A protein has these predicted regions:
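Alpha-helical transmembrane segments within multi-pass membrane transporters and channels
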Residues: 39-41
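Short, basic and Ser/Thr-rich N-terminal targeting/leader segments
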Residues: 30, 66-69, 198
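Hydrophobic residues at beta-strand termini and immediately following loops
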Residues: 37, 84, 213-214
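Glycine-rich phosphate/adenosyl-contacting loop at the front of the ribokinase-like
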Residues: 1-37, 48, 220-221
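Ribokinase/PfkB-type carbohydrate-kinase core domain
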Residues: 51-63, 76-210
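C-terminal catalytic lobe of FAD-dependent flavoproteins
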Residues: 72
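Conserved phosphate-binding/catalytic region of the ribokinase-like
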Residues: 2, 178-266
Length: 266
C-alpha cells in the first residue's frame, strides 16, 4: 500500500531484469536476432546473472572484474514503482570491449539512459558516432536530466529515435504541451519521437506527421518493464519493415500484457 517505513517486514524476490535485458527478452520472443552487449560482473549479483544467462543460453559478451550492481523495485498496489539503484559493472563500459563488434553486422542499436549517465569517457557515444549507418533507439528514462548535458547533447545530435514518457519529455524540454515538447526535442534529434502515455497509449511525432495510438485496456498489476517491452517491440517490428502505426499498435499490445502480470518480462 505504501513505501516501507521503520520496522516494516518486507518480502523480497530476486529476479533478473534491467532495461537492456528486458528489451532483449522481447526481441527473442519476436524472433528478432540480437546481441546483448551488456557487461556481467562479479559478486552475488554477477553470479546470479551469469547463472541465468547460462540457463537461458544467452552468450556473455563482456566479462567485467567490477562487481555487478542491483536495483530494488518497490511496487505499490496501483502497479506503479519506485527504483533504488546501485550502479555496478553493468553500467560501465571500456573502449576495448567494442573491438569485438563488427558494426557492419548490425542495423539497429538500443541505448539506455543509465549507460550514458555513467559513460564518462563517452566510449558508447564514440562507437555510435563512428558508425552512422546504425539506427539508434535511445530510452533516456527518468534520469534524462541527470545525464551530463554536453554528453547527452552529443548523443541526441546522432539522430536517435527517442522513446520516453510524458513526464520525461516535459521535464527535458520544460514544456507542458505534448506537441510543443515533441517539436522542441525534434529540433535537436531530427528523428521520430515516441512518447508513452500509460493508460492513454502513446504518441508519435516526426516532421511530417504526428498521431496518437490508444492503449489496450488491461488491469495493471506491475508497471516494471512496461517501457522496455514497448521499445523492444518497436525495434523488432521496425526490423521487419512494419509501418509506424501498426508498429505502435503492436507495442501497446505487448506492453499491456507485461503490466497485467507480475515481473518485467513475459
Amino acid at each position: 500500500d505504501a513505501l516501507p517505513i521503520y520496522e516494516n517486514i518486507i518480502h523480497q524476490e530476486l529476479s533478473i531484469g534491467g532495461c537492456a535485458y528486458n528489451v532483449a527478452h522481447i526481441l527473442d520472443n519476436m524472433h528478432c536476432p540480437y546481441d546483448l552487449f551488456s557487461p556481467v560482473g562479479q559478486g552475488i549479483y554477477g553470479d546470479f546473472v551469469r547463472k541465468h544467462f547460462k540457463e537461458k543460453k544467452i552468450p556473455i559478451m563482456i566479462e567485467s572484474q567490477q562487481k555487478n550492481g542491483c536495483c530494488y523495485c518497490l511496487v505499490d498496489d496501483s502497479g506503479e514503482r519506485t527504483f533504488i539503484c546501485e550502479h555496478g559493472a553493468e553500467y560501465f563500459y571500456q573502449a576495448s570491449w567494442f573491438d569485438q563488434l563488427d558494426a557492419n553486422n548490425y542495423q539497429q542499436v538500443y541505448v539506455c539512459g543509465l549507460e550514458i549517465e555513467e559513460d564518462h569517457d563517452e566510449v558508447i557515444i564514440q562507437f555510435l558516432a563512428s558508425h552512422p549507418h546504425l539506427t539508434i533507439y535511445f530510452a533516456p528514462g527518468p534520469r534524462i536530466n541527470a545525464i551530463e548535458r554536453k554528453r547527452l547533447m552529443k548523443l541526441l545530435y546522432l539522430h536517435p529515435i527517442v522513446h520516453l514518457n510524458q513526464q520525461e519529455i516535459f521535464e527535458f524540454t520544460k514544456q507542458n504541451d505534448l506537441s510543443i515538447a515533441c517539436a522542441s526535442l525534434y529540433q535537436i534529434t531530427q528523428a521520430p519521437i515516441i512518447v508513452t502515455l500509460g493508460k492513454d497509449g502513446c504518441y508519435y511525432y516526426d516532421e511530417k506527421t504526428s498521431f496518437h495510438t490508444p492503449s489496450i485496456k488491461t488491469t495493471v498489476v506491475d508497471t516494471i518493464g512496461a517501457g522496455d517491452s514497448h521499445i523492444g517491440t518497436i525495434i523488432a517490428c521496425r526490423s521487419q519493415d512494419m509501418n509506424w502505426p501498426d508498429c505502435l499498435i503492436k507495442a501497446n499490445q505487448i506492453a499491456s500484457l507485461v503490466v497485467s502480470q507480475k515481473g518485467s518480462t513475459l
